Amino acid sequence: MTRLLDTGLEQLTVMVYRSGEAAGNAINVSIRGLLNCKDETETVRELSDIIGSMTVEIENKAFELIVKYQPVASDLRIINSYMKIAYDFERYGRYAWDISFTQQKLAKINKCAVSSDLMLKLIEKVTGMVNKSVAALKQHDAELAKTLGNTEKEVDELYFAYLNKLSKARSKDKCVMCNLLVSRYLERIADHTTYVGEAIVYIATGEKIILR
């Protein structure tokens, strides 16, 4: 027999997944703007605001389920994990906006094309992690979620290698500042994908792990 709480949890699952899709879209738009030297600041800001509103709706839904149905420990685990994931998706959106805003303010859009192999690899790794985190949530795939840990270590290596390269650059102009900040935002997004992965593993198996 299906519990009323189960229906509510299914609704919560859909809400969080849609938030993840929106967050992934925000990152894709910001990266597209970065690579194509196009100002996507307003578009990404709007997406980030939408994700923020979705997070509030998710929190309200979670509290509604807790108050109405007084869930047992296993259900509370799921609800709490979804709230954590929603927060991390909100951070995806915020960092996407930070990337676009930094590009617009410092790089003046057309002056700083991304050409470094290290930065391009960093972008590829991080966007892949974002997509994988959303896919793992949709499927409640603990094994897929666990793979985010190894990729995050690769991102850290690329990030520090890129920092080392920038530190040796003769020019310390706005392009260098822009690339430095963007690489940091990408590294932070990667961190948040591992937090999502940890929560997915907990939802699927009840196992508490650290992926970073």
Which role fits each region the language model picked out?
Residues 1-212:
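Cytosolic, long alpha-helical scaffolding segments
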